[in-house]
Regions:
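Phosphate- and other anionic-substrate recognition elements at nucleic-acid/protein interfaces
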Residues: 1-182
Length: 182
């Protein structure tokens, strides 16, 4: 791909109840634009298989509409509850399937790497991640809910990878700013 061609990235924060997503376009001059963000919600009363189908269909629809070429997804974390980890793995599986079916370039990032990429520390709070997503994309307001901001952060992790050394001072300032606010 030539450097001047824009890349559309779909970032995903997976979950069985709420899956956050963010679609970011990166042009050849490294300008980043938020195209869309939001959440895919499933009904807790539905059987797991139906919820997974809804997640797959929601992600497939985003891919169909926006035609991203890159999928950046948060990797699984290890919860104390083994069932939670297994169920989250199922959600990730159907999301990865949708990306693979579309021929996307797939990148998986641990939660701490996503936090570090956008907020400067792997221990960043959801508020700090949300604040930096807003700053980095020059948004008027923070993406809501936080699951959507986390999806955008996943997309930014891929998009910012070559730029991370240059934005480190900005992230440090943002972490200090959010600490002052609380």
């Amino acid at each position: 791909m030539r450097e001047s061609e824009p890349t559309v990235v779909l970032g995903i924060d997976p979950g069985t109840a709420v899956t956050g997503y963010g679609i970011v376009r990166k042009d050849g001059h490294n300008a980043l634009v938020l195209i869309e963000c939001g959440v895919i919600r499933t009904k807790p009363s539905d059987a797991l298989a139906h919820r997974l189908s809804d997640i797959h269909d929601g992600v497939a629809e985003l891919i169909r509409r926006h035609k991203p070429t890159v999928l950046a997804i948060e990797d699984i974390f290890y919860a104390r509850n083994v069932r939670t980890t297994v169920v989250l793995g199922h959600a990730r599986g159907v999301i990865l399937l949708a990306g693979a079916q579309a021929g996307m370039d797939i990148h998986e990032y641990p939660p701490s790497e996503i936090k570090k990429a956008v907020a400067g520390t792997g221990a960043a709070t959801k508020l700090q991640v949300q604040f930096m997503v807003t700053r980095l994309l020059r948004l008027k307001s923070a993406p809501q809910p936080t699951d959507a901001a986390d999806g955008v952060a996943a997309a930014l992790t891929w998009a910012l990878a070559p730029e991370l050394p240059k934005i480190e001072p900005i992230r440090r300032l943002a972490v200090m700013e959010t600490r002052r606010q609380h």
